[in-house]
C-alpha cells in the first residue's frame, strides 16, 4: 500500500499520554486507515526514545504465524529497511526477531522465556523505544530486548502487521 494512500485514508487515533519511569510523558500517535489484516499504517514522527507502540488483538483459531514489522517507510522497490520483524511461529512455539538493513538480514534472535500467544485468545504487545534498544512486552511481561540495527530512529515510521490474527486496537 503506498504511503500517500495510507496518509490520505488515515484516521487519527485519539492521542494518549503515556509515561515511563525513565522518561517524561510522551504522546503515542499512530495513524491508520482501518484495523484489517494485512495492515500498514504510519507512525507520526517516527520512533524516538520514550515512544511506545501498542498492538492489541486476538490470535486466530488455528494459527500458523503472524508478524509485526516496524519499517522505514513502505517502499517495495527498493525494499524499505525493516527495523524489527517479530514473527510468532505457532508450530515451533517461537517468537523470532530480526532486522533487514540495506537489503541484508541480520542474525535472527529466538530466545524467549516462554511462548506467550494462545490460539483464539486476546493479546497485548507493547514496543517501547529506548535509546539503545526496543523493549518488547506481551501481556504486561517483558520478553526481550532488541538492540537497534537501524541508526536513525525517526526513519522508523511505518508499522505492518500480517498473518493469523485480528487487530482490535493500535496506539
From Swiss-Prot:
InterPro entries given in the database record: ConA-like_dom_sf, Galectin-like, Galectin_CRD
Keyword Transmembrane helix: no
Keyword entries, A-Z: Lectin
CDD domains: GLECT (cd00070)
Transmembrane segments: none
UniProt keyword Metal-binding, yes or no: no
Domain Galectin: 38-170
Pfam (any one): Gal-bind_lectin
One Gene Ontology molecular-function label: carbohydrate binding
Functional summary from the UniProt entry: Does not bind lactose, and may not bind carbohydrates.
Protein name per UniProt: Galectin-related protein
Lineage: Eukaryota, Metazoa, Chordata, Craniata, Vertebrata
Amino acid at each position: 500500500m503506498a504511503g500517500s494512500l495510507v496518509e490520505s485514508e488515515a484516521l487519527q487515533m485519539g492521542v494518549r499520554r503515556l509515561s515511563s519511569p525513565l522518561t517524561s510523558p510522551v504522546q503515542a500517535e499512530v495513524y491508520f486507515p482501518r484495523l484489517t489484516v494485512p495492515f500498514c499504517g504510519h507512525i507520526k514522527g517516527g520512533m524516538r526514545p520514550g515512544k511506545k507502540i501498542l498492538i492489541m488483538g486476538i490470535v486466530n483459531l488455528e494459527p500458523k504465524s503472524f508478524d509485526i514489522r516496524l519499517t522505514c517507510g513502505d517502499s517495495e522497490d527498493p525494499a524499505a529497511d525493516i527495523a524489527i520483524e517479530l514473527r510468532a511461529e505457532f508450530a515451533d512455539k517461537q517468537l523470532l526477531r530480526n532486522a533487514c538493513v540495506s537489503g541484508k538480514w541480520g542474525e535472527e534472535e529466538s530466545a524467549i522465556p516462554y511462548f506467550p500467544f494462545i490460539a483464539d485468545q486476546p493479546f497485548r504487545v507493547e514496543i517501547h523505544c529506548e535509546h539503545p534498544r526496543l523493549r518488547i512486552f506481551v501481556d504486561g511481561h517483558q520478553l526481550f530486548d532488541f538492540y537497534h540495527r537501524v541508526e536513525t530512529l525517526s526513519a522508523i515510521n511505518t508499522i505492518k502487521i500480517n498473518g493469523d490474527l485480528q487487530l482490535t486496537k493500535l496506539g
